[in-house]
Regions:
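A short helix-to-beta-strand connector/capping loop
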Residues: 56-64, 74
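A glycine-rich helix->loop->beta "capping" turn
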Residues: 59-62, 82-91
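Canonical Rossmann dinucleotide-binding motif of NAD(H)/NADP(H)-dependent dehydrogenases/reductases
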Residues: 5-38
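Rossmann-fold scaffold of SDR-type NAD(P)-dependent oxidoreductases
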Residues: 16, 67-68, 90-91
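Amphipathic, non-transmembrane alpha-helical secondary structure
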Residues: 24, 28, 32, 50, ...
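The beta1-alpha1 cofactor-binding region of Rossmann-like NAD(H)/NADP(H)-dependent oxidoreductases
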Residues: 46, 66-81
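Generic hydrophobic, amphipathic alpha-helix propensity
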Residues: 8, 22, 49-52, 56
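Conserved glycine-rich Rossmann-like NAD(P)H-binding loop of the short-chain dehydrogenase/reductase
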Residues: 35-51
Length: 91
């Protein structure tokens, strides 16, 4: 099956560690397949995570970016709450 036959249209995804490397690739691949994608990373100061979010939006998908330390239960709850509010769910 080629990516053109694989559709995630209408789905909502969350990718942790999406600033670079594999996480970035996963986020962009999900968006290319039609999903709206929330991207998170512990480091957002470099602007790389925002750039990933902007690439997703350039594909016509909805995207938000969030600073999240997944070792912090408080941060994880805040992340999930924000994604649920903005996207209405996570598939």
């Amino acid at each position: 099956m080629s990516l053109s036959e694989f559709s995630l249209s209408g789905k909502k995804a969350l990718v942790i560690g999406a600033r670079r490397n594999m996480g970035k690739g996963f986020a962009l691949g999900l968006a290319e397949a039609g999903a709206d994608v929330a991207v998170t990373d512990i480091n957002i100061e470099s602007g790389q995570l925002q750039a990933v979010s902007e690439q997703i939006e350039a594909m016509g998908r909805k995207s938000i970016f969030l600073k999240t330390d997944i070792s912090s239960q408080k941060d994880v709850k805040k992340m999930v709450d924000k994604v649920m509010l903005e996207f209405g769910g996570i598939d």
